[in-house]
From Swiss-Prot:
Required for the activation of lactoyl-CoA dehydratase. This protein is extremely sensitive towards oxygen. Keywords: 4Fe-4S, Iron, Iron-sulfur, Metal-binding. One of its GO terms (molecular function) is lactoyl-CoA dehydratase activity. [4Fe-4S] cluster binds at C125, C164. Binds 1 [4Fe-4S] cluster per dimer. It comes from the Bacteria. This is Activator of lactoyl-CoA dehydratase. The keyword Iron-sulfur applies. Homodimer. It comes from Anaerotignum propionicum. The lineage of its organism: Bacteria, Bacillati, Bacillota, Clostridia, Lachnospirales.
Amino acid sequence: MYTLGIDVGSASSKAVILKDGKDIVAAEVVQVGTGSSGPQRALDKAFEVSGLKKEDISYTVATGYGRFNFSDADKQISEISCHAKGIYFLVPTARTIIDIGGQDAKAIRLDDKGGIKQFFMNDKCAAGTGRFLEVMARVLETTLDEMAELDEQATDTAPISSTCTVFAESEVISQLSNGVSRNNIIKGVHLSVASRACGLAYRGGLEKDVVMTGGVAKNAGVVRAVAGVLKTDVIVAPNPQTTGALGAALYAYEAAQKK
């Protein structure tokens, strides 16, 4: 039996195809979000990789901001539930999930059975999200991929005191004009993102193991900063952008069994 999970996010769409509720046969990401083409492109890539067709899918669950825009889904489930489901499948010891996506950040507390105990979310401001990093990369004339490497070369941390993206952008420009090292500024940017995410995690009381997911988890500089703020090891989920879609595919498998 094949089931499908689609995660329609603000910056990207993800598709995961699961076989018999346990084997991942495709996990694809396209950098197009809630627009109509994003989910379909992710789905097309998943079908291409797996060699499957639409008719092979027994059940489909959509999640993410744009989940109601994907008309082929049998069911829609919140991204909080799907991230929890996906992470518990991958890392059963997870008790705290830190998810930093394109437009929001979340902290989710799990019990020992993978149930959600608490969750906290920042979706009111771009600061502390992938969007914040994109803005800073543009100002610093670098790429998101290069930022983690430049962070490693930093000799100090140039703190970013502003919690608003617009003011933080001005602060970074001022630091550059004052001759502050770009690498040190990048380290400060990563610390700023990490601090906001860790603030959410601390609100519920931190429990180990801590697992990071979302696109920003691919940035080793942010992961190091999160570990430093929390003073604990941080596990990066395998293929961290697709954990929500994986959770959706797992929910789809459960639903298909009840049909």
